[in-house]
Amino acid sequence: ATNDNKDVFLRHAGVLALAKVGEESPRSVLQLARHGSESVRLAAVVALRRIGNSGVAMFLNDTSEKVVNEAAHAIHDEFSIPAAMPSLAGLLDVGLVSSEPVLRRAINANLRLGRPQNAMRLAKFAARETAPEAMRVEALRTLSSWPSPFKLDRVEGRFRDLGTRPVEQAHDVLDQHIGELLSSKSDAVRGATAEAISKLNYGNAAERLTRLANDNSLTAAIRASAVEALHSIDADGADEAVAAALKAESPELRATAVRILAKRNPDAGELMASLQSGLKSDHLREQQNALGVLGSLKSLEAVSLLEAQTKRLAKGTAPATLHLDILE
């Protein structure tokens, strides 16, 4: 305690000593959770991590953010301490933790545990307006991957094959929280919710998504995500939403609509008109999007438009910012 983490050699020696004690008498080390010195409690956490003792979960309730952070790392990282994982996952219920490293591990702990109640916890956390916005978005992205999690850990990048889960588990929690999520005060959360609906092919939100897609007061990113989601779930109002988005003031929204229309109805007459408008747009992204969509079409009209662009390139009249897009 008197060293107070100042001498790293003493600190390391102390950790090794505590780990040795913990192997013989874990209770002796666990009792340090009540010690008044933060440095002692930190050393206790590191020692418990070395011996893989699940009692380290006690330190998740510590008053020191450093200690809680160390405990979260101990439970989650490297080879982990599986028996303590539920305690880490449960931190999302508390509402008192604001540390991003801790919350990321708590979110991922729920993904790794993979039970229906863990999916529900992620949705509840994402719907909580007082939680950090970035972490609410992370919870939604994690929920989006629920049926088939990526094999590289979302926090560490370590290989972890979590297998597959029924997509219905994610659908069930969205049934209960979709209203809160799509009406959130956070634009980022609403956008992430729309993306989750797309990835999970969740079909019970079409009416709400249509309202988002047509709401001119919202950002283009949210409206574009809503249109994408309507297309992904093949909602009844998807074609109408795409048609409305084609006429939007936002180039981002128009570009999204053109891309979706090319997938839904590549022979639509308004598609070629929109692509021609996109090529003449003052916005680079819309021009690039139009070229990309043209490259995916096989109609004679599309080929003709592309040939016109390659001729511009050959003559040196095409903007330098579009050279690569035309060649591709």
Where are these regions (language model features)?
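Core register positions within helices of long alpha-helical scaffolds
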Residues: 13-20, 46-50, 74-77, 105-112, ...
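HEAT-repeat alpha-solenoid elements in large eukaryotic scaffold proteins
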Residues: 99-102, 140-160
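Amphipathic alpha-helical scaffolding segments comprising HEAT/armadillo-like alpha-solenoid repeats
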Residues: 1-2, 22-34, 51-61, 80-94, ...
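Short, intrinsically disordered, charge-balanced linker/junction segments flanking boundaries
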Residues: 1, 186, 250, 325-328
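Extended surface/linker regions that mediate inter-domain or inter-protein docking
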Residues: 124-125, 138-145, 163-168, 173, ...
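Primarily the internal scaffold of c-type cytochrome electron-transfer domains
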Residues: 1-15, 69, 94-109, 165, ...
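Alpha-helix N-cap/helix-start positions at coil->helix boundaries
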Residues: 7-8, 38-39, 65-69, 96-101, ...
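Alpha-solenoid HEAT/ARM repeat scaffold
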Residues: 8-12, 42, 69, 100-104, ...
